[in-house]
Structures are given as structure tokens and as C-alpha cells.
From Swiss-Prot:
It comes from Mus musculus. Coiled coil: none annotated. This is Prolactin-5A1. GO terms for cellular component: extracellular region. It is found in: Secreted. The gene is Prl5a1. Residues 1-30 form the signal peptide. Keywords: Disulfide bond, Glycoprotein, Hormone, Secreted, Signal. GO terms for molecular function: hormone activity.
């Protein structure tokens, strides 16, 4: 779905007011439709996508660092890397496994898929802290990075929800709110044996890194589809 491109309104003051309000609002559903129709919609979407793209890149990079840090600390001989990982809890037929498939999806569908993927990592910090607190070595370094990742996931989710709310102003049939399932911790971290537990954590960080790459790709695709040539 592409929004029709409209020439920007001459009143820069109105747009600046809209942007400043956007930063304070928990929900942008109160943005007046008339503002959406004068070109401000495209500008606000572009503004949010700029922030979201930067966060998603950081999320992707930090997830990769966390996986590498964990393997360096707890799998120095790379035994885990030579084994198939556990099936990722976000694996689903509805989630495209490459960029080409994602590009063929309708933007509103891909947007929902991306939000669902992020929601599936909602309890990441809780599970990591509970399962790494008693490990030898320096788990606090990894936990500190997971705390940053947790904040990035929350920011990404909020931004994508705001984008969805704005799009619902243009397309009233688009659902504004949906229930997105959280993650129970299975299958990675509910293990008692240390070696199995470590492999489960390796699989967790592997899946997180894989999803972070997908989220970054999906956001890039959504930006090109929804605010092209901005």
C-alpha cells in the first residue's frame, strides 16, 4: 500500500507542532485527519521511519555482538556452532525467511508480522537474567547488553505501533490494536543440566540475532514501500 504523494503544506509551523506533539503522545490516534491530508502524514511517517531504522540497525548489531560474546565466553571450542540450533520460537510460515519474500507481502501484513516478531521477544530480559545469573565467567557483560536490546525492542514496537496508527487514519479498515503473544521461554531456557542450558542460551541468542536481522530488513522494506523517495 503506497500513500499518495501530496505536495507539502506551506505552513511549516503546523508541521513542527505536529512533530513535537508526536514525541509526547503515547498514542498518535488523535492526529487530526485534516493534517494527514495536507502532506503532514508523509512527513511524520518519514520522521518515524528515520528513528526506527537507526534503532533497528543498533538492535541488529548489538544482537550479533551478544551472540559472539556468549559463544566466546561459554563455547570457546565452537561445539555449539557445529550443532543444529533449537527451532526458533518465532519460526512460522507467516514470517518470510528472506527479503525477496518480504518484498512481495502487502505492507500492512509485513508491518503486523514485524510487530509480532518483536512481541515474541517481550520477556527476553527476564529469561536471560534468570538463567545466566548463576553462570561462571562474566554473565553480567552479556546481561547488560540484553538490557539495551530489551529497551530497543520496546522502542521499535512503540514506533511501529505509531506507524500502524497513522496508517489507520488513511485506511480505517486497518486494525489499530491487536493482541500479540509474548514468549514463554520455551524451548531454550527451561533446562536443568548445565551443558543443555548453555546450548539453549546459545540457541536463544542465535535466534535473537536471526530475528534482529529480519526486523532490520523488514523495516527497510516497509520504509521503501510506505514513504518512497523520501
Amino acid at each position: 500500500m503506497r500513500l499518495s504523494k501530496i505536495q507539502p503544506h506551506q505552513s511549516g509551523t503546523l508541521l513542527l507542532l505536529l512533530l513535537s506533539n508526536l514525541l509526547m503522545w503515547e498514542n498518535v490516534a488523535s492526529v487530526p485527519r485534516c493534517i494527514m491530508e495536507d502532506g503532514g502524514c508523509q512527513k511524520v511517517l518519514n520522521y518515524i521511519f528515520n528513528m526506527t531504522s537507526t534503532i533497528s540497525e543498533n538492535f541488529n548489531n548489538l544482537s550479533s555482538e551478544t551472540l559472539n560474546d556468549f559463544d566466546t565466553e561459554y563455547d570457546p571450542h565452537q561445539k555449539f556452532q557445529n550443532r543444529p540450533t533449537m527451532t526458533c520460537h518465532t519460526s512460522s510460515r507467516s514470517v518470510p525467511n528472506n527479503k525477496r519474500k518480504a518484498e512481495r507481502m502487502r505492507p500492512v501484513v509485513l508491518l503486523n508480522v514485524t510487530i509480532r516478531m518483536l512481541a515474541a521477544w517481550k520477556n527476553l530480559l527476564h529469561h536471560v537474567e534468570n538463567n545466566m545469573a548463576d553462570l561462571d565467567g562474566t554473565p553480567y557483560v552479556i546481561i547488560s547488553k540484553v538490557k539495551l536490546i530489551d529497551r530497543q525492542i520496546k522502542k521499535l514496537t512503540k514506533n511501529l505501533q505509531n506507524i500502524k496508527t497513522i496508517l489507520s487514519q488513511v485506511n480505517p479498515d486497518l486494525k489499530k490494536n491487536e493482541d500479540y503473544p509474548a514468549w514463554s521461554g520455551e524451548p531454550y531456557v527451561q533446562q536443568s543440566k548445565r551443558r543443555v542450558q548453555l546450548f539453549g542460551l546459545h540457541s536463544l541468542f542465535f535466534c535473537l540475532n536471526n530475528d534482529a536481522q529480519k526486523v532490520s530488513d523488514f523495516i527497510s522494506i516497509l520504509r521503501d514501500q510506505i514513504v518512497p523517495n523520501q
